[in-house]
């Protein structure tokens, strides 16, 4: 048997080597860790901190330094006020600030307001760029419409 084939079989776990004559081949049992185990460990750690559940939290938004927001819809929140510890459970979604703007204006702090100003400035510059293109189109359309002359009342001519 060549060494390459032996190494492949050893990697699979199908070859016993060095265990002696009487030892049977045994497959290694793979134990899959579940997230439930992590949750139990987290729960026991939080119980040590004496956390209390906070009811009626509709949403949680965490503002990141790059301007994006981690948004939790209907999360479970536990708090330990003396140790200033908060635990938030739920599915978090990465969203841009523009997606949440109307609903989160009252939640913004001074840092987030600065990023909102930058966002507004970039939006205005985009609008001006689009507006410049539209103005060119408007000027072409204005050639068909005559200018109003002062002193003339066109409504009298209609009647």
Curated annotation (Swiss-Prot):
The keyword Cytoplasm applies. One of its GO terms (cellular component) is nascent polypeptide-associated complex. The keyword Transport applies. Keywords: Cytoplasm, Nucleus, Protein transport, Repressor, Transcription, Transcription regulation, Transport. Residues 23-32 have a biased composition (Basic residues). Residues 36-101 form the NAC-A/B domain. It is found in: Cytoplasm; Nucleus. Residues 136-153 have a biased composition (Acidic residues). InterPro entries: BTF3, NAC_A/B_dom_sf, Nas_poly-pep-assoc_cplx_dom. Coiled coil: none annotated. Residues 1-39, 124-159 are annotated as: Disordered. GO terms for biological process: protein transport. Pfam families: NAC. Component of the nascent polypeptide-associated complex (NAC), a dynamic component of the ribosomal exit tunnel, protecting the emerging polypeptides from interaction with other cytoplasmic proteins to ensure appropriate nascent protein targeting. The NAC complex also promotes mitochondrial protein import by enhancing productive ribosome interactions with the outer mitochondrial membrane and blocks the inappropriate interaction of ribosomes translating non-secretory nascent polypeptides with translocation sites in the membrane of the endoplasmic reticulum. Belongs to the NAC-beta family. Part of the nascent polypeptide-associated complex (NAC), consisting of EGD2 and EGD1. NAC associates with ribosomes via EGD1. PANTHER family: TRANSCRIPTION FACTOR BTF3 FAMILY MEMBER. This is Nascent polypeptide-associated complex subunit beta.
